[in-house]
C-alpha cells in the first residue's frame, strides 16, 4: 500500500503564502517516495502532525481523509532567497530593458505589443521558477508593500531591496556593454508632463499590486496561476502607459538603466509613484477581500488553490 497512488481531498494548508517568512508564491509540497519520486498516502500524512499513519483503516476506502493540519513553511535560507531574488530581478530587468533598446535600435520593430509581451513573459517565468524560493518580489515597491501589511518581515526588506538594486545595475551595465551607444533606449523617461507621469505610474502600480496581493496572500484566489495573472497585469499596464512613461512600475527598472546611461531625468517620479501606488493597491485589496470567516461561495469555481 505504501507505493499505491491515491488521490487526496483538496485542502488549504494553515501556512499560507502570505505568512511572514514563507514564500509569497508557493504551493503545497508533500514528501515523496524515495524509490520512484511519487507521492504516497503515508508520505502525505507524515507531513501533517494531526494524523497517525499507523492506522491503516484511514486509507482503506481508496482516498485520503481531508487534510486540515498545519504544514511547516519551507526551510529556505535567507542566502538562497537573496540569490533567487537577484537572479529573478536580473532576468526581468535584462529582458524588459533589452526589448526597449532593440525597439529603438530597429525603429520600432518590436512594437508596443512586443515590449509588453517581453516584460509580461519575463515576470511570468520568473515567478513560476523562483516564486517558491524567494517569493519573487522583483520590485522594491512590492517588498515594501508586503512588509507594510505584515506579509513580509521588515528585517529582510533592506537586503531584499539591496539584491534587487544590484541585479538592476548588473543587468543595465551588461546591456550597456552590448548595445552602447544606444543604451538610452532602455531608460524610462516620460513623454508627458511630470504630474501626468506621476499619476500614470501611481495607477499602474496600484493595478499591479492589487493583483499581486490577491494571488499571493489570499488562499481563495487563483494561486496556481499567480505567474500568469501578474504577467498579464504587467502587459496590460505597459499597453496603457508605455508610450507616456515607459510603464516602469518598479523603481529598479528605472534606477539601473538610469545609472548606466547617466540619465536621471524625472527619476523621482519612478522612485516614489510605484511605491505609493503599491502601498495603496495592497491596502485596497486587504480591505475588499472576503473575511476569513466567511463561507466559501456556493457556486463552483474554475480554479482553486
Swiss-Prot record:
Q: What is this protein called?
A: Aquaporin NIP6-1
Q: Which gene encodes it?
A: NIP6-1
Q: Where is the composition biased (Low complexity)?
A: 7-23
**Which function does this protein serve?**
Transports glycerol, urea and formamide, in Xenopus laevis oocytes. Very low water transport activity.
| Tissue/organ expression | Expressed in roots.
Tell me which InterPro entries the record gives: Aquaporin-like, Aquaporin_transptr, MIP, MIP_CS
Q: Does the keyword Transcription apply?
A: no
Query: Per the similarity annotation, which family is this?
Result: Belongs to the MIP/aquaporin (TC 1.A.8) family. NIP (TC 1.A.8.12) subfamily.
The Gene Ontology CC terms held by the record are:
plasma membrane
Task: Give the motif span (NPA 1).
Answer: 139-141
**Which residue windows are transmembrane per the record?**
82-102, 111-131, 159-179, 194-214, 221-241, 267-287
Respond yes or no to whether keyword Transmembrane helix is given for this record: yes
Copy the domain comment.
Aquaporins contain two tandem repeats each containing three membrane-spanning domains and a pore-forming loop with the signature motif Asn-Pro-Ala/Val (NPA).
Amino acid at each position: 500500500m505504501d507505493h499505491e497512488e491515491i488521490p487526496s481531498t483538496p485542502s488549504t494548508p494553515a501556512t499560507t503564502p502570505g505568512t511572514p517568512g514563507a514564500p509569497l508564491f508557493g504551493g503545497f509540497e508533500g514528501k515523496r517516495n524515495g524509490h520512484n519520486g511519487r507521492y504516497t498516502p503515508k508520505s502525505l500524512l507524515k507531513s501533517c502532525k494531526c494524523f497517525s499513519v499507523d492506522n491503516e483503516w484511514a486509507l482503506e476506502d481508496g482516498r485520503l481523509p481531508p487534510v486540515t493540519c498545519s504544514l511547516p513553511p519551507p526551510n529556505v535560507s535567507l542566502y538562497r532567497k537573496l540569490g533567487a531574488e537577484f537572479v529573478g530581478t536580473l532576468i526581468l530587468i535584462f529582458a524588459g530593458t533589452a526589448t526597449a533598446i532593440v525597439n529603438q535600435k530597429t525603429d520600432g520593430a518590436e512594437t508596443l505589443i512586443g515590449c509588453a509581451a517581453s516584460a509580461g513573459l519575463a515576470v511570468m517565468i520568473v515567478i513560476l521558477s523562483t516564486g517558491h524560493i524567494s517569493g519573487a518580489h522583483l520590485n522594491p515597491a512590492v517588498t515594501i508593500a508586503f512588509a507594510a501589511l505584515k506579509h513580509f518581515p521588515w528585517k529582510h526588506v533592506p537586503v531584499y531591496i539591496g539584491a534587487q538594486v544590484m541585479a538592476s545595475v548588473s543587468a543595465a551595465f551588461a546591456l550597456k556593454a552590448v548595445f552602447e551607444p544606444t543604451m538610452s533606449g532602455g531608460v524610462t523617461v516620460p513623454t508627458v508632463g511630470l504630474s501626468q507621469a506621476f499619476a500614470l505610474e501611481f495607477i499602474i502600480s496600484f493595478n499591479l499590486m492589487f493583483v499581486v496581493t490577491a494571488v499571493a496572500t489570499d488562499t481563495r484566489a487563483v494561486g496556481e496561476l499567480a505567474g500568469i495573472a501578474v504577467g498579464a497585469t504587467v502587459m496590460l499596464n505597459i499597453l496603457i502607459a508605455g508610450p507616456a512613461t515607459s510603464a516602469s512600475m518598479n523603481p529598479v527598472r528605472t534606477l539601473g538603466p538610469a545609472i548606466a546611461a547617466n540619465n536621471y531625468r524625472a527619476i523621482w517620479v519612478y522612485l516614489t509613484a510605484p511605491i505609493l501606488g503599491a502601498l495603496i493597491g495592497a491596502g485596497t485589496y486587504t480591505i475588499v477581500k472576503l473575511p476569513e470567516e466567511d463561507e466559501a461561495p456556493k457556486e463552483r469555481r474554475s480554479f482553486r488553490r
